[in-house]
Amino acid sequence: MIPSWVSLRAGDYEKIINVRRALSRHGIYTVCEGAKCPNIFHCWGEGTATFMILGEVCTRACRFCAVRTGNPRGYVDWGEVDRLVEAVRELGLKYVVVTSVARDDLPDGGASVFAAVVKKLREVGCVVEVLVPDFGGSPASVKTVVSSGPDVFAHNVETVRRLTPLVRDRRAGYERSLSVLKYAKEFGAPLTKSGLMLGLGETFEEVVETLEDLRRADVDIVTIGQYIKPSGSPRHLNPVRYATPEEFAKIKEVAVSLGFKAVASGPLVRSSYKAYSLYREALKNIVYLG
Protein backbone atom coordinates (compact mmCIF):
# COMPACT_ATOMS: atom_id res chain seq x y z
CA MET A 1 0.00 0.00 0.00
CA ILE A 2 1.22 3.48 -0.86
CA PRO A 3 1.69 5.46 2.39
CA SER A 4 -0.17 8.67 3.14
CA TRP A 5 2.89 10.89 2.64
CA VAL A 6 3.06 9.85 -1.01
CA SER A 7 -0.12 11.78 -1.78
CA LEU A 8 -0.92 13.49 -5.06
CA ARG A 9 -1.91 17.14 -5.12
CA ALA A 10 -4.24 18.97 -7.46
CA GLY A 11 -3.66 22.43 -8.86
CA ASP A 12 -5.57 25.37 -10.30
CA TYR A 13 -8.18 23.82 -12.63
CA GLU A 14 -8.25 26.74 -15.07
CA LYS A 15 -4.48 26.68 -15.51
CA ILE A 16 -4.56 22.91 -16.00
CA ILE A 17 -7.06 23.34 -18.84
CA ASN A 18 -4.99 26.14 -20.39
CA VAL A 19 -1.84 24.03 -20.41
CA ARG A 20 -3.63 21.01 -21.88
CA ARG A 21 -5.22 23.12 -24.63
CA ALA A 22 -1.94 24.80 -25.58
CA LEU A 23 -0.09 21.49 -25.77
CA SER A 24 -2.85 19.89 -27.83
CA ARG A 25 -3.12 22.85 -30.19
CA HIS A 26 0.59 22.80 -31.00
CA GLY A 27 1.01 19.02 -31.02
CA ILE A 28 3.61 19.09 -28.24
CA TYR A 29 4.36 16.21 -25.89
CA THR A 30 5.23 16.54 -22.22
CA VAL A 31 7.15 14.15 -20.04
CA CYS A 32 4.48 14.94 -17.45
CA GLU A 33 2.03 12.86 -19.49
CA GLY A 34 4.43 10.43 -21.15
CA ALA A 35 6.12 9.35 -17.92
CA LYS A 36 2.89 9.54 -15.86
CA CYS A 37 4.45 11.97 -13.38
CA PRO A 38 2.55 12.11 -10.06
CA ASN A 39 2.94 15.90 -9.96
CA ILE A 40 1.32 16.56 -13.33
CA PHE A 41 -1.77 18.40 -12.12
CA HIS A 42 0.10 20.28 -9.43
CA CYS A 43 2.66 21.62 -11.93
CA TRP A 44 0.10 22.26 -14.66
CA GLY A 45 -1.99 24.04 -12.05
CA GLU A 46 0.95 26.42 -11.62
CA GLY A 47 1.21 26.90 -15.38
CA THR A 48 4.44 24.93 -15.80
CA ALA A 49 5.29 21.85 -17.85
CA THR A 50 8.35 19.90 -18.98
CA PHE A 51 8.36 19.64 -22.75
CA MET A 52 9.45 16.41 -24.43
CA ILE A 53 11.06 16.71 -27.86
CA LEU A 54 12.10 14.14 -30.47
CA GLY A 55 8.74 12.42 -30.41
CA GLU A 56 7.15 10.12 -27.85
CA VAL A 57 8.83 6.80 -28.70
CA CYS A 58 12.01 5.95 -26.79
CA THR A 59 14.64 3.54 -28.09
CA ARG A 60 15.28 2.31 -24.55
CA ALA A 61 13.22 0.36 -22.03
CA CYS A 62 14.18 1.42 -18.51
CA ARG A 63 12.17 -0.48 -15.92
CA PHE A 64 11.01 2.60 -14.01
CA CYS A 65 9.68 4.58 -16.97
CA ALA A 66 6.25 4.64 -18.63
CA VAL A 67 7.35 6.24 -21.92
CA ARG A 68 6.62 4.01 -24.93
CA THR A 69 9.52 1.96 -26.33
CA GLY A 70 10.17 1.39 -30.02
CA ASN A 71 12.30 2.36 -33.01
CA PRO A 72 11.52 5.74 -34.65
CA ARG A 73 13.91 4.76 -37.49
CA GLY A 74 15.67 8.10 -37.68
CA TYR A 75 12.55 10.24 -38.05
CA VAL A 76 12.81 13.81 -36.74
CA ASP A 77 9.96 16.30 -36.90
CA TRP A 78 11.85 19.59 -37.19
CA GLY A 79 8.59 21.52 -37.08
CA GLU A 80 8.38 20.47 -33.44
CA VAL A 81 10.94 23.16 -32.57
CA ASP A 82 8.79 26.08 -33.73
CA ARG A 83 5.61 24.55 -32.29
CA LEU A 84 7.25 24.23 -28.89
CA VAL A 85 8.33 27.88 -28.95
CA GLU A 86 4.78 28.94 -29.87
CA ALA A 87 3.36 26.91 -26.99
CA VAL A 88 5.83 28.57 -24.63
CA ARG A 89 4.80 32.01 -25.90
CA GLU A 90 1.12 31.17 -25.48
CA LEU A 91 1.62 29.98 -21.91
CA GLY A 92 3.81 32.97 -21.05
CA LEU A 93 6.61 30.84 -19.63
CA LYS A 94 9.91 32.41 -18.60
CA TYR A 95 11.59 29.23 -17.34
CA VAL A 96 11.37 26.23 -19.64
CA VAL A 97 12.49 22.64 -19.08
CA VAL A 98 13.10 20.58 -22.22
CA THR A 99 13.73 16.84 -22.15
CA SER A 100 13.52 14.01 -24.67
CA VAL A 101 13.22 10.32 -25.19
CA ALA A 102 16.47 8.45 -25.89
CA ARG A 103 17.17 8.37 -29.63
CA ASP A 104 19.87 5.79 -30.23
CA ASP A 105 18.66 5.66 -33.85
CA LEU A 106 20.12 9.13 -34.54
CA PRO A 107 23.87 9.67 -35.13
CA ASP A 108 24.09 12.42 -32.50
CA GLY A 109 21.36 11.04 -30.24
CA GLY A 110 19.23 14.11 -30.93
CA ALA A 111 21.75 16.66 -29.67
CA SER A 112 21.30 18.93 -32.70
CA VAL A 113 17.55 19.13 -32.05
CA PHE A 114 18.17 20.07 -28.42
CA ALA A 115 20.55 22.78 -29.61
CA ALA A 116 17.99 24.18 -32.05
CA VAL A 117 15.32 24.33 -29.35
CA VAL A 118 17.62 26.03 -26.84
CA LYS A 119 18.66 28.70 -29.33
CA LYS A 120 15.04 29.45 -30.27
CA LEU A 121 13.95 29.67 -26.64
CA ARG A 122 16.84 31.97 -25.76
CA GLU A 123 15.77 34.25 -28.61
CA VAL A 124 12.38 34.76 -26.94
CA GLY A 125 13.96 35.49 -23.56
CA CYS A 126 13.48 32.19 -21.73
CA VAL A 127 15.72 30.68 -19.10
CA VAL A 128 16.28 27.12 -20.35
CA GLU A 129 16.96 23.86 -18.55
CA VAL A 130 17.68 20.75 -20.62
CA LEU A 131 17.27 17.24 -19.23
CA VAL A 132 19.13 15.07 -21.70
CA PRO A 133 19.64 11.33 -22.34
CA ASP A 134 23.23 10.04 -22.31
CA PHE A 135 23.74 10.41 -26.11
CA GLY A 136 25.56 7.08 -26.03
CA GLY A 137 28.27 8.78 -23.97
CA SER A 138 29.32 11.00 -26.90
CA PRO A 139 31.37 14.05 -25.80
CA ALA A 140 30.61 15.69 -29.17
CA SER A 141 26.86 15.47 -28.58
CA VAL A 142 27.21 16.90 -25.07
CA LYS A 143 29.29 19.75 -26.49
CA THR A 144 26.65 20.46 -29.14
CA VAL A 145 24.00 20.94 -26.47
CA VAL A 146 26.17 22.92 -24.06
CA SER A 147 27.36 25.21 -26.87
CA SER A 148 23.76 26.20 -27.61
CA GLY A 149 23.63 27.98 -24.25
CA PRO A 150 21.28 26.23 -21.79
CA ASP A 151 21.25 27.74 -18.31
CA VAL A 152 21.03 24.31 -16.66
CA PHE A 153 22.32 21.03 -18.12
CA ALA A 154 20.66 18.04 -16.43
CA HIS A 155 21.17 14.31 -16.81
CA ASN A 156 19.86 11.79 -14.30
CA VAL A 157 21.94 9.03 -12.81
CA GLU A 158 18.55 7.58 -11.68
CA THR A 159 19.78 5.05 -9.11
CA VAL A 160 22.84 3.82 -7.25
CA ARG A 161 25.69 2.02 -9.00
CA ARG A 162 24.71 -1.52 -7.87
CA LEU A 163 21.11 -1.25 -9.07
CA THR A 164 21.81 0.42 -12.42
CA PRO A 165 21.79 -2.84 -14.47
CA LEU A 166 18.43 -3.81 -12.93
CA VAL A 167 16.72 -0.42 -13.16
CA ARG A 168 17.99 1.12 -16.39
CA ASP A 169 18.18 -0.08 -19.98
CA ARG A 170 21.26 -2.22 -20.70
CA ARG A 171 22.68 0.55 -22.92
CA ALA A 172 22.79 2.96 -19.99
CA GLY A 173 25.56 2.98 -17.42
CA TYR A 174 26.36 4.57 -14.08
CA GLU A 175 29.86 5.66 -15.10
CA ARG A 176 28.60 6.82 -18.49
CA SER A 177 26.08 9.11 -16.80
CA LEU A 178 28.77 10.57 -14.57
CA SER A 179 30.93 11.14 -17.66
CA VAL A 180 28.11 13.01 -19.41
CA LEU A 181 27.83 15.35 -16.43
CA LYS A 182 31.61 15.84 -16.30
CA TYR A 183 31.75 16.62 -20.02
CA ALA A 184 29.01 19.21 -19.61
CA LYS A 185 31.01 21.10 -16.99
CA GLU A 186 34.21 20.79 -19.00
CA PHE A 187 32.45 22.30 -22.01
CA GLY A 188 31.20 25.26 -19.98
CA ALA A 189 27.72 24.44 -18.67
CA PRO A 190 26.95 27.12 -16.03
CA LEU A 191 25.00 24.70 -13.82
CA THR A 192 24.67 20.92 -13.94
CA LYS A 193 21.96 18.85 -12.31
CA SER A 194 21.14 15.20 -11.67
CA GLY A 195 18.52 13.12 -9.91
CA LEU A 196 17.95 9.73 -8.35
CA MET A 197 15.07 7.66 -7.02
CA LEU A 198 14.72 5.91 -3.68
CA GLY A 199 12.77 2.75 -2.92
CA LEU A 200 14.41 0.34 -5.34
CA GLY A 201 16.47 -1.56 -2.79
CA GLU A 202 19.37 0.84 -2.27
CA THR A 203 20.98 1.37 1.13
CA PHE A 204 21.55 4.73 2.81
CA GLU A 205 25.30 4.25 2.36
CA GLU A 206 24.84 3.69 -1.38
CA VAL A 207 22.79 6.88 -1.67
CA VAL A 208 25.55 8.83 0.07
CA GLU A 209 28.13 7.24 -2.23
CA THR A 210 26.08 8.31 -5.26
CA LEU A 211 25.83 11.87 -3.96
CA GLU A 212 29.60 11.89 -3.44
CA ASP A 213 30.13 10.65 -7.00
CA LEU A 214 27.89 13.42 -8.33
CA ARG A 215 29.82 16.05 -6.40
CA ARG A 216 33.09 14.67 -7.74
CA ALA A 217 31.56 15.23 -11.18
CA ASP A 218 31.00 18.87 -10.08
CA VAL A 219 27.20 18.60 -10.19
CA ASP A 220 25.50 21.67 -8.67
CA ILE A 221 21.86 20.65 -8.20
CA VAL A 222 20.38 17.31 -7.15
CA THR A 223 16.84 15.99 -6.85
CA ILE A 224 15.89 12.91 -4.81
CA GLY A 225 12.42 11.36 -4.95
CA GLN A 226 10.45 8.19 -4.29
CA TYR A 227 10.09 5.62 -7.07
CA ILE A 228 6.42 4.98 -7.81
CA LYS A 229 5.53 2.17 -10.20
CA PRO A 230 3.95 3.84 -13.26
CA SER A 231 1.75 0.92 -14.34
CA GLY A 232 0.74 -2.64 -13.55
CA SER A 233 3.02 -3.98 -16.28
CA PRO A 234 5.51 -6.67 -15.20
CA ARG A 235 8.14 -4.67 -17.12
CA HIS A 236 7.96 -2.01 -14.43
CA LEU A 237 9.67 -2.75 -11.14
CA ASN A 238 7.73 -2.91 -7.90
CA PRO A 239 8.96 -0.53 -5.19
CA VAL A 240 10.96 -2.40 -2.55
CA ARG A 241 9.95 0.16 0.07
CA TYR A 242 8.75 3.72 0.58
CA ALA A 243 11.27 6.06 2.16
CA THR A 244 9.87 8.23 4.95
CA PRO A 245 9.87 12.05 4.96
CA GLU A 246 12.46 11.86 7.75
CA GLU A 247 14.77 9.82 5.53
CA PHE A 248 14.42 12.32 2.72
CA ALA A 249 15.23 15.14 5.15
CA LYS A 250 18.33 13.30 6.37
CA ILE A 251 19.52 12.73 2.80
CA LYS A 252 19.00 16.41 2.03
CA GLU A 253 21.21 17.31 4.98
CA VAL A 254 23.93 15.04 3.61
CA ALA A 255 23.62 16.54 0.12
CA VAL A 256 23.87 20.09 1.44
CA SER A 257 26.91 19.16 3.54
CA LEU A 258 28.59 17.75 0.42
CA GLY A 259 28.34 21.13 -1.27
CA PHE A 260 25.39 20.92 -3.67
CA LYS A 261 24.17 24.45 -4.46
CA ALA A 262 20.50 23.40 -4.41
CA VAL A 263 18.75 20.22 -3.23
CA ALA A 264 15.17 18.96 -3.51
CA SER A 265 14.49 15.79 -1.53
CA GLY A 266 11.03 14.39 -0.85
CA PRO A 267 8.59 11.62 -1.78
CA LEU A 268 7.08 13.41 -4.80
CA VAL A 269 10.21 15.18 -5.99
CA ARG A 270 11.00 14.56 -9.66
CA SER A 271 13.74 15.86 -11.97
CA SER A 272 11.91 19.06 -12.88
CA TYR A 273 10.20 19.60 -9.53
CA LYS A 274 10.26 23.33 -8.70
CA ALA A 275 13.00 23.67 -11.31
CA TYR A 276 12.96 27.46 -11.42
CA SER A 277 13.19 27.73 -7.62
CA LEU A 278 16.16 25.34 -7.54
CA TYR A 279 17.85 27.30 -10.33
CA ARG A 280 17.50 30.56 -8.40
CA GLU A 281 18.68 28.91 -5.19
CA ALA A 282 21.77 27.55 -6.94
CA LEU A 283 22.63 30.96 -8.39
CA LYS A 284 22.20 32.59 -4.98
CA ASN A 285 24.46 30.03 -3.32
CA ILE A 286 27.12 30.36 -6.00
CA VAL A 287 27.27 34.10 -5.26
CA TYR A 288 27.10 33.53 -1.48
CA LEU A 289 29.80 30.86 -1.47
CA GLY A 290 31.98 32.88 -3.82
From Swiss-Prot:
Q: What class of enzyme is it?
A: transferase
Q: Where does [4Fe-4S] cluster 2 bind?
A: 58, 62, 65
A Pfam family that the UniProt record links to this protein: Radical_SAM
Q: This protein's superkingdom?
A: Archaea
GO CC terms of this entry = cytoplasm
**Ranges in a coiled coil:** none
The EC designation for this entry is 2.8.1.8
Q: Could you tell me what reaction this enzyme catalyses?
A: [[Fe-S] cluster scaffold protein carrying a second [4Fe-4S](2+) cluster] + N(6)-octanoyl-L-lysyl-[protein] + 2 oxidized [2Fe-2S]-[ferredoxin] + 2 S-adenosyl-L-methionine + 4 H(+) = [[Fe-S] cluster scaffold protein] + N(6)-[(R)-dihydrolipoyl]-L-lysyl-[protein] + 4 Fe(3+) + 2 hydrogen sulfide + 2 5'-deoxyadenosine + 2 L-methionine + 2 reduced [2Fe-2S]-[ferredoxin]
Instruction: Provide the residue positions that the database annotates as binding [4Fe-4S] cluster 1.
Output: 32, 37, 43, 272
PANTHER family membership:
LIPOYL SYNTHASE, LIPOYL SYNTHASE, MITOCHONDRIAL
Q: What is this protein called?
A: Lipoyl synthase
Q: Give the taxonomic lineage as stored in the record.
A: Archaea, Thermoproteota, Thermoprotei, Thermoproteales, Thermoproteaceae
